[in-house]
Amino acid sequence: MMEVPREIIEKLEIFQKLVKKWNKSINLVSDNTIHNFWQRHILDSLQLIQYIDNKEIHLVDIGSGSGLPGIVLSIAGVAQVSLIEADLRKCIFLEKASKISNNNIQIINQRIEKVEIDCSILTCRAFSNLNTIFNCIKNISVREKFLLLKGKNYLTEIVEAKERWLFGYLIHQSITCEEGKILEVSNLTKMI
């Protein structure tokens, strides 16, 4: 398992309590995952940190409603994180949750398609399939790579995306779920 410094664990526990509190009024995570929140959500998000070589970067997290993985990665040391979320209620939650981190977090309350931004790494979790993700981010410049938390249909998503897009990828096994994969995508280009 991952070794996590005590001060980060304490901040992640505060974040966990905040998500559970807000989840009662706005649906941030599935109710049937609340009992296993640390494993299912915190560690699932935190495992991405091992694929981020330099934490002094700008990371963009799309569909960030619950702050997973964006806020978790900020708490773990990523210097600058932008969270893109269209739902204003979830942005209010993200604003409160962002105070837990010592790093720079920007909340962008817009549809992803309308956001113009540059970043080193783009993340998302429980958002959509690869084709939809790639189509949504037409105005986002990703210099280094994508770190995408995917489920059991990841191979089908790759095959379908390869019909419209050129990209390199690595598949990493999730440490939290046998079906889960981390898809590391680079050099994304749309086919003509």
Swiss-Prot record:
Cellular-component GO terms for this entry: cytosol
Coiled coil: none
Database matches in Pfam families: GidB (PF02527)
Its EC number(s): 2.1.1.170
Keyword field contains Methyltransferase: yes
Catalytic activity line of the entry: guanosine(527) in 16S rRNA + S-adenosyl-L-methionine = N(7)-methylguanosine(527) in 16S rRNA + S-adenosyl-L-homocysteine
Keywords recorded for this protein, A-Z: Cytoplasm, Methyltransferase, rRNA processing, S-adenosyl-L-methionine, Transferase
Compartments, record wording: Cytoplasm
List of residues binding S-adenosyl-L-methionine: G63, L68, I112, E113, R125
InterPro entries: rRNA_ssu_MeTfrase_G, SAM-dependent_MTases_sf
Any GO molecular function: rRNA (guanine-N7-)-methyltransferase activity
Domain of life where this protein originates: Bacteria
Family: Belongs to the methyltransferase superfamily. RNA methyltransferase RsmG family.
Physiological role: Specifically methylates the N7 position of guanine in position 527 of 16S rRNA.
Name of the protein described by the UniProt record: Ribosomal RNA small subunit methyltransferase G
Natural source organism: Rickettsia africae (strain ESF-5)
Gene for this chain: rsmG
